[in-house]
């Protein structure tokens, strides 16, 4: 009887020792991961380039195009996102210049009717709805004097002067882009009581989260 009690006690102590040894390991692992994330944040992201080298500078500065000529509104107020190959073909049915990337685009996409699989920098989660119509020049310029480019650049990367699209950083865990809008960015305007008074808008969660 005593031997059995001793055996049970030994087993209990063994289990306690095993747990006691594992706890510091897991705590150390968590600390190491958090420190690594803080010290080397880029390790969380994979870097990808766009399938076609697209020059906003040529289209915006040289050709005088505006954002809305390629990024138009849907009926629900959201942007249609990226232009289709058909819309690009309105100007690029044939090669216009000497850029080899344009020649490749015409050959691989325009002639075949294939869509370019552009990497979206600010693709939002499915539970987030953002109305571009509600954030238009007509609304913001009741008080401000933004140009279209200035208004877009409040949320989007300023690429008008770039000959190449920025590198796309994709989160290895979530699949979302590093540039996906964060709530603190929205709060720059939505936490301002003066904005709410002028626009009669609401900060209720369901306005943006569906």
UniProtKB/Swiss-Prot annotation:
Keywords: Cell inner membrane, Cell membrane, Electron transport, Heme, Iron, Membrane, Metal-binding, Oxidoreductase, Sulfate respiration, Transmembrane, Transmembrane helix, Transport
EC primary class: oxidoreductase
Name this polypeptide is given: Menaquinone reductase, multiheme cytochrome c subunit
Subunit composition and interactions: The Qrc complex is composed of four subunits: QrcA, QrcB, QrcC and QrcD. Can form a supercomplex with the [NiFe] hydrogenase HynA1 and the tetraheme Type I cytochrome c3 TpIc(3), its physiological electron donors.
PROSITE patterns, A to Z: MULTIHEME_CYTC
Residues binding heme 3, per UniProt: 140, 143-144
Transmembrane segment boundaries: 20-40
Membrane topology type: Single-pass membrane protein
GO molecular function, one term: heme binding
Binding positions for heme 4 per the UniProt entry: 152, 155-156
Entry's localization field: Cell inner membrane
Gene: qrcA
Native species: Nitratidesulfovibrio vulgaris (strain ATCC 29579 / DSM 644 / CCUG 34227 / NCIMB 8303 / VKM B-1760 / Hildenborough)
GO cellular component term, pick one: plasma membrane
